[in-house]
Amino acid sequence: MQKQHQRQHKVELVANLKSQFDSAKALLICDYKGLSVKKLEALRNKARIQGIKVQVIKNTLAHIAMKEVGCADLDLKETNVFLWGDDQIALSKLVFDFQKEHKDHFVLKAGLFDKESVSVAHVEAVSKLPSKEELMGMLLSVWTAPARYFVTGLDNLRKAKEEN
């Protein structure tokens, strides 16, 4: 009875992982060997704020879930922590910022963006892109520039007329 209950729990876990992996736009797999629980919890807390899921998953269960999603080409060995979410840039920034702080114990191993395998170099390049909020700020600045220059020009014209 105990084994059957454990098996049912694993089947439910794989089904849950499959649905989450299937809906995620980005998934990164990192080696966390030697990382303390406290530091892993700090990563989870940072991720939670950004809507990113962080979970240590048994490799065999993760492999089954990945296979069902159509991403079976990943070689899952050693100790892995899985991070996934909908924002590729935020996820990449989170992983590389955390990796800078803990380079001896936290290393990006593999990544999937829109269920396509991507290299570590690609993920690093994405991590250097501006975030969605930064891009919106840049765009807003570009849109408001003509009005800002027009108002500045009118103000300069008013000052010039006052001096004369």
Curated annotation (Swiss-Prot):
InterPro entries linked to this entry: Ribosomal_uL10 (IPR001790), Ribosomal_uL10-like_sf (IPR043141), Ribosomal_uL10_bac (IPR022973), Ribosomal_uL10_bac_type (IPR047865), Ribosomal_uL10_CS_bac (IPR002363)
Any GO BP annotation: translation
UniProt-listed Pfam families: Ribosomal_L10
GO MF term set: large ribosomal subunit rRNA binding; structural constituent of ribosome
Keyword terms, alphabetized: Ribonucleoprotein, Ribosomal protein, RNA-binding, rRNA-binding
A GO term from the CC aspect: large ribosomal subunit
Gene3D superfamilies hit by this protein: 3.30.70.1730
Family: Belongs to the universal ribosomal protein uL10 family.
Function of the protein: Forms part of the ribosomal stalk, playing a central role in the interaction of the ribosome with GTP-bound translation factors.
Subunit structure: Part of the ribosomal stalk of the 50S ribosomal subunit. The N-terminus interacts with L11 and the large rRNA to form the base of the stalk. The C-terminus forms an elongated spine to which L12 dimers bind in a sequential fashion forming a multimeric L10(L12)X complex.
NCBIfam families attached to this UniProt entry: PRK00099.1-1
Name the UniProt record assigns to this protein: Large ribosomal subunit protein uL10
